[in-house]
Amino acid sequence: MKIRVPATSANLGPGFDSMGIAVSKYLEVDILEERDQWFIEHDLGDIPNDDSNLLIQTALRLAPNIPAHRLKMTSDIPLARGLGSSSSVIVAGIELANQLGHLNLTDDRKLAIATRIEGHPDNVAPAIFGQLVIASQIGKDVDYIIAPFPDLSLVCFIPDYELKTSDSRDVLPKQLSYKQAVAASSVANLAIAALLTGNLKKAGRAIENDQFHEIYRQRLVREFQPIKRAAAANGAYATYLSGAGPAIMVMCPNKKKMAIYEAIEQLGLIGQLVSLELDRQGLCLV
């Protein structure tokens, strides 16, 4: 049995901590034979291969009596880059407990558990459901909408350095004034409405006019402004920080994808430039 969870790109500008899409990079976990102690085969560097791994910790949190197994974990989701690496592991851990513990969890229950562990639903929701998910957490309650995503292309630049979410949150203001909050939420409302109605030019303007986090975080990602300028000059709808960064996502018309890809490539930045697709399936068994 194999568990597969997609990478995610959260926020989409002003949808701070509440909106995200699933994209075509994946964490996969093969559930192999039972053994006396947990063991994870992987080639992912300094990640633990025993029961101190977040994957197994998450599973045991839900089902402490499930038998230990040998697991094989593979992933092309880069760590601490703003593509939901920790969320994918949490969601996979929940499904591991669900399968081995025969918990029969609904997707809604998986989302509630994942949100409680992660702290907000913007990554874990699209990791579970795929597509574009807009979610709200008030207390313990998590409400969400799985929404159609426009037909467009995604080009992502992944810098070769990590940016931990905790460090990225440290640059945010502790509070916004009432006037600032109203302005920021109006931009978010417009971005969502424009995405859902297919008005991608207005969606792009709203995404790039985020007032919640990107205006504070972009100075941590030196590649952001050069990529944003190059993408805009070649017809992109919007450029935004994926999650807490440092990954940078460009939304563009399908016919402009190659021109934008080449323009970013010509900047000579150090990192990985990839073309991504929307993942429509989310968490699944394969």
UniProtKB/Swiss-Prot annotation:
According to its UniProt record, in which pathway does this protein act?
A: Amino-acid biosynthesis; L-threonine biosynthesis; L-threonine from L-aspartate: step 4/5
Q: State a single Gene Ontology molecular function.
A: homoserine kinase activity
What keywords is this UniProt entry annotated with?
Answer: Amino-acid biosynthesis, ATP-binding, Cytoplasm, Kinase, Nucleotide-binding, Threonine biosynthesis, Transferase
Q: Name one GO biological process term.
A: threonine biosynthetic process
Q: What is its EC number?
A: 2.7.1.39
Give compartment(s).
Cytoplasm
Q: What does this protein do?
A: Catalyzes the ATP-dependent phosphorylation of L-homoserine to L-homoserine phosphate.
State the encoding gene: thrB
- Give the family, as the similarity comment puts it: Belongs to the GHMP kinase family. Homoserine kinase subfamily.
Span of the secretion signal? none
Official protein name in the record:
Homoserine kinase
Q: Which domain of life is it from?
A: Bacteria
